[in-house]
Swiss-Prot record:
Protein role: Catalyzes the condensation of carbamoyl phosphate and aspartate to form carbamoyl aspartate and inorganic phosphate, the committed step in the de novo pyrimidine nucleotide biosynthesis pathway.
EC number, UniProt record: 2.1.3.2
Catalytic activity: carbamoyl phosphate + L-aspartate = N-carbamoyl-L-aspartate + phosphate + H(+)
Pfam families given in the database record: OTCace (PF00185), OTCace_N (PF02729)
Protein's GO biological process: 'de novo' pyrimidine nucleobase biosynthetic process; 'de novo' UMP biosynthetic process; amino acid metabolic process
Organism: Nitratidesulfovibrio vulgaris (strain DSM 19637 / Miyazaki F)
Keywords per UniProt: Pyrimidine biosynthesis, Transferase
Binding-site list for carbamoyl phosphate: R64, T65, R114, H142, Q145, G271, P272
Protein name: Aspartate carbamoyltransferase catalytic subunit
A GO cellular component entry from the record: cytosol
UniProt xrefs under InterPro entries: Asp/Orn_carbamoyltranf_P-bd, Asp/Orn_carbamoylTrfase, Asp/Orn_carbamoylTrfase_sf, Asp_carbamoyltransf, Asp_carbamoyltransf_Asp/Orn-bd
Gene3D superfamilies, per the entry: Aspartate/ornithine carbamoyltransferase
Entries under HAMAP family matching the protein: Asp_carb_tr
Gene that this polypeptide is encoded by: pyrB
Family: Belongs to the aspartate/ornithine carbamoyltransferase superfamily. ATCase family.
Length: 325
């Protein structure tokens, strides 16, 4: 069988979107599109990573990201193993380095890590021989979420990112999702706007490649997409928020706001949602919503990431070759 030659994947790890060139980004997205097609078939499992092992090391609570990686690994026929902080020696005072070295002794091919400390994924990547995927480190980065968001927007926009406008709405200060999306989408020529209470904007935000708004009615004018962020309710207890009812009145995205956006504007949310606080239920379930598309994109994109890291292949993967590169 003939195989089409493709560029080899040069990275051992995926730690941040900033490490990817434009060509590498679109190679990853093209690979995700192939897996997205496979995921729509009656039989979704392929033997591509049979014999490979993936450890899901989540030292922070997670449902969506962890499940998405687990499904992605299993659909590639990899063996996946989950480790939560409560079930690891970290909860007994063991250092991250010692836990990581213990995991490496088990010879996994990939470790997917989520940790409350910024830089935790890079710390592991510099010390371990296996590949490391950053599934969220503190407030620093969430590269796989930004990649799946980019994939979801590409399904609507095609490759025409230049000149588009995206509004990110909500708790920017504590959002690694916002940081990764700002870096990735602005690098593609997307004009990024932020809208949040002043207390929920991060220090140094004026150095970001963004335009900042305090009023949602102004921020949403003419945008091509709105990304709502989860409002972390513990911030309200810390005095960073006004009354929640007041917040919803000022910053909850509604169908009225979407009438001010571009005619084909779409809505995204990384989840979990607080309906009626960050986004109205009507809009979350509307045809303009890409929220469920993001979930499907998450599995396909993470399949692509695991595949590229585990094989670093230069051979195009096709469904008809049984998943063998």
């Amino acid at each position: 069988m003939q195989h089409a030659q493709r560029p080899t994947w040069p990275h051992k790890d995926l730690l941040d979107v900033t490490q990817l060139t434009r060509a590498e980004l679109f190679h990853l997205l093209d690979t995700a599109a192939q897996f997205h097609d496979i995921n729509r078939r009656p039989v979704k499992k392929v033997p591509t990573l049979k014999g490979k092992s993936v450890v899901l090391f989540f030292a922070e609570p997670s449902t969506r990201t962890k499940t998405s990686f687990d499904v992605a690994g299993k659909r590639l026929s990899a063996d996946t193993f989950s480790l939560a902080k409560s079930g690891s020696s970290l909860s007994k005072g063991e250092s991250l380095k010692d836990t990581a070295l213990t995991l490496q002794a088990m010879t996994p091919d990939i470790i997917v890590i989520r940790h409350s400390s910024s830089g935790a994924a890079q710390f592991l990547a510099e010390r371990l021989d296996c590949s490391v995927v950053n599934a969220g480190d503190g407030w620093h980065a969430h590269p796989t979420q930004a990649l799946l968001d980019c994939y979801s927007l590409r399904q609507v926009w095609g490759d025409t990112f230049e000149g588009r406008t995206l509004l990110i709405l909500g708790d920017i200060a504590h959002s690694r999702v916002a940081r990764s999306n700002v870096h990735l989408l602005s690098s593609l020529g997307v004009k990024v706007r932020l809208c949040a209470p002043r207390t929920l904007l991060p220090a140094g935000v004026h150095n970001w490649p963004v335009t900042i708004f305090n009023r949602l009615d102004d921020a949403v004018q003419g945008v091509d997409a709105v990304m709502c962020l989860r409002l972390q309710l513990e911030r309200q207890q810390a005095g960073l928020l006004p009354d929640l009812r007041e917040y919803a009145q000022r910053f909850c995205l509604s169908p009225r706001h979407l009438t001010m956006a571009a005619p084909s504007a779409r809505v995204l949310h990384p989840g979990p949602m607080n309906r009626g606080l960050e986004i109205s239920s009507v809009l979350a379930d509307a045809p303009e919503s890409l929220i469920l598309d993001q979930v499907a994109a998450g599995v396909a994109t993470r399949m692509a990431i695991l595949f590229l890291l585990a094989t670093r292949t230069g051979i195009e993967q096709t469904a008809d070759n049984g998943g063998r590169a």
